[in-house]
């Protein structure tokens, strides 16, 4: 099977063309391939499939390193767009894809950055999903003997975002896994630790559902900005600084889609016998 290794700001992927190849991945096989000592090694596997809807260009599937399938990965979406162009599957600059939960437009710029229309952030608890009687701007969660004030949003996948004074010393290793599997998130969640530098600049670390802390999380950056704007902490255009690099997030507020712009890097092509 042919594949490519790619990354978006250090969030790394094994990308597989299932348009021209017949492939099947069990959770066990994905876990073996994800192993950084004995496999290919990656945070997520991205699979390019033929479109389920003839009006679209491709279907986009995402698998975490633990073998679970998820509905959204923003950094992966940028790599997906670069991959289908590099492999000659399309020459379009505006690429339409479906996911488990919706549709996206991926736009490749002249300087090969990728702008992703991530859709409108959804704060309704049942859509996240999150167990709450009604939608609030902030919720109180208790985890590992800590009381956490957070915002909750779906970007096509569930996110919990908390504000911290200094992201460099945030207790991601302790709070990340506890909040990821908190009982109020029936499908688990991605956990963002956000330091607000100014209304146009945040620093962010993300503990990803099924992958642990990564160098960057695109949907996590989108979620953090959406929550920050909802809580009136941020403006419409925000520079998001992650351990692996920076993204630009733009959102005009309710009724409008959120846009994420950033790089996608091709590392190498490979072949593996399954």
Swiss-Prot record:
Intracellular or extracellular location(s): Cytoplasm
Enzyme Commission code: 5.1.1.7
Site description Could be important to modulate the pK values of the two catalytic cysteine residues, residues in chain: 159, 208
Transmembrane segments: none
Biological process, per Gene Ontology: lysine biosynthetic process via diaminopimelate
GO molecular function, one term: diaminopimelate epimerase activity
Binding-site residues for substrate, renumbered to this chain: 11, 44, 64, 74-75, 157, 190, 208-209, 218-219
Residues flagged as site, Important for dimerization: 268
Signal peptide range: none
Residues the record marks as active site: 73 (proton donor), 217 (proton acceptor)
GO CC annotations on file: cytosol
Catalysis: reaction(s): (2S,6S)-2,6-diaminopimelate = meso-2,6-diaminopimelate
Pathway: Amino-acid biosynthesis; L-lysine biosynthesis via DAP pathway; DL-2,6-diaminopimelate from LL-2,6-diaminopimelate: step 1/1
Protein family membership: Belongs to the diaminopimelate epimerase family.
Subunit relationships: Homodimer.
Matches recorded under HAMAP family: DAP_epimerase (MF_00197)
NCBIfam families given in the database record: DapF (TIGR00652)
Function: Catalyzes the stereoinversion of LL-2,6-diaminopimelate (L,L-DAP) to meso-diaminopimelate (meso-DAP), a precursor of L-lysine and an essential component of the bacterial peptidoglycan.
Protein name: Diaminopimelate epimerase
Organism whose genome encodes this protein: Yersinia enterocolitica serotype O:8 / biotype 1B (strain NCTC 13174 / 8081)
């Amino acid at each position: 099977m042919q594949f490519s290794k790619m990354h978006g700001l250090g969030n790394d992927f094994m990308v597989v063309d299932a348009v021209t190849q017949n492939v099947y991945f069990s959770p066990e096989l994905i876990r073996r391939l994800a192993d950084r000592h004995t496999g290919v090694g990656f945070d997520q596997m991205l699979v390019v499939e033929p479109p389920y809807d003839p009006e679209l260009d491709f279907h986009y599937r995402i698998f975490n390193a633990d073998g679970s399938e998820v509905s959204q990965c923003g950094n992966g979406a940028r790599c997906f767009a670069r991959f289908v162009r590099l492999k000659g599957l399309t020459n379009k600059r505006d690429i339409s894809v479906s996911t488990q939960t919706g549709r996206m437009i991926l736009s490749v710029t002249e300087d090969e950055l990728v702008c992703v229309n991530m859709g409108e952030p959804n704060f309704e608890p049942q859509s996240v999903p999150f167990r709450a009687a009604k939608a609030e701007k902030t919720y109180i969660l208790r985890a590992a003997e800590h009381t956490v004030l957070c915002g909750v949003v779906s970007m096509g996948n569930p996110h919990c975002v908390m504000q911290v004074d200094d992201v460099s010393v945030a207790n991601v290793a302790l709070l990340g896994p506890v909040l990821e599997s908190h009982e109020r998130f029936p499908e688990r969640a991605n956990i963002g630790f956000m330091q607000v530098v100014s209304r146009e600049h945040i620093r962010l670390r993300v503990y990803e559902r099924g992958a642990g802390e990564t160098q960057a999380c695109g949907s996590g950056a989108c979620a953090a900005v959406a929550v920050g704007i909802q809580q009136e902490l941020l403006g419409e255009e925000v520079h998001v600084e992650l351990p692996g690099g920076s993204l630009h997030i733009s959102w005009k507020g309710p009724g409008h889609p959120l846009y994420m712009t950033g790089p996608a890097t091709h590392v190498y092509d490979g072949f593996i016998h399954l």
